[in-house]
C-alpha cells in the first residue's frame, strides 16, 4: 500500500437546500478561485470527484476550470461514496432536505402530513441545525454519522491502491453531513457547518493510517 492525499470539500454556495439545487453565480466564482489555488499549490496532477448532486458537480466543474491544466486533471468524475447519507422514509431512499414537503416529493404518493406525523423526520425538519441533530442520533432511519465516517475512511484508504489516481491529489466535492461526520469521528466533537468549498485534508499513510485535519484551500 502506498500513500495518498485527498481534499474533501463542501460544494459551493446554494440559495437553499430544497432539492437538487444549482450553485449560485457567487458560488461558482468561489469554486473557480479555489481550483486556481489548488492548482498553484499542488504543482502536479489532480483528480476531481463529486458526490452525485447538481451542486457538487457544478462545484467540481468550476474547480477544474480554475486548475486550468486539463492535461493534468482527471475528472470531474461522479463518485458514489461521496453521496449524501443513505436515509429512508416509507420504503424510499431520501435526501435530507429542509422541509416536510420536500421529503414528501421524494416518496411516491406520500403527503406532507404523513411526513409531519413521522416522529424522527418531524424532529429533523424542525431542528435549527438539522445536520447537527442527525449527528447526535444513534439509530436514525438510515446511516448514522459513524456509518458515514466509516464509509469515507474506507473510501480514502482505497486510493492507496495502485490505480489511475496514484500520485495525484484527489479533490472530493461532497456535502456537509459527510464532512462533519469525518471530522467528528476524528475529534469527538461536531465542528459545526463547514464553509462553502472548505473541508478536510486527508493523508493516507503506508500502513493505511489516516491523518485528517480541517482545510481551506484559500487560507491554507
Regions found by a protein language model. Give the residues of each.
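Active-site-proximal alpha-helix that buttresses catalytic centers in soluble enzyme cores
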Residues: 1-86, 138-146, 192-215
Amino acid at each position: 500500500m502506498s500513500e495518498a492525499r485527498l481534499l474533501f470539500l463542501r460544494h459551493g454556495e446554494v440559495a437553499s437546500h430544497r432539492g437538487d439545487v444549482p450553485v449560485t453565480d457567487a458560488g461558482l466564482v468561489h469554486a473557480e478561485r479555489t481550483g486556481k489555488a489548488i492548482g498553484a499549490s499542488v504543482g502536479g496532477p489532480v483528480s476531481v470527484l463529486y458526490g452525485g448532486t447538481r451542486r457538487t458537480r457544478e462545484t467540481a466543474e468550476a474547480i477544474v476550470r480554475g486548475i486550468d491544466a486539463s492535461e493534468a486533471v482527471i475528472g470531474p468524475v461522479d463518485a458514489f461514496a461521496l453521496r449524501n447519507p443513505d436515509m429512508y422514509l416509507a420504503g424510499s431512499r431520501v435526501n435530507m432536505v429542509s422541509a416536510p414537503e420536500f421529503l414528501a416529493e421524494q416518496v411516491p404518493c406520500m403527503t406532507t402530513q404523513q411526513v409531519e406525523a413521522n416522529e424522527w423526520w418531524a424532529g429533523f425538519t424542525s431542528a435549527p441545525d438539522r445536520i447537527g441533530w442527525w449527528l447526535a442520533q444513534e439509530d436514525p432511519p438510515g446511516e448514522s454519522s459513524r456509518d458515514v465516517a466509516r464509509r469515507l475512511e474506507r473510501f480514502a484508504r482505497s486510493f492507496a491502491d495502485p490505480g489511475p489516481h496514484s500520485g495525484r491529489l484527489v479533490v472530493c466535492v461532497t456535502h456537509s453531513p459527510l464532512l462533519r461526520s469525518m471530522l467528528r469521528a476524528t475529534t469527538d466533537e461536531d465542528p459545526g457547518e463547514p464553509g462553502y468549498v472548505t473541508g478536510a485534508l486527508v493523508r493516507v499513510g503506508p500502513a493505511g493510517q489516516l491523518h485528517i485535519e480541517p482545510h481551506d484551500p484559500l487560507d491554507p
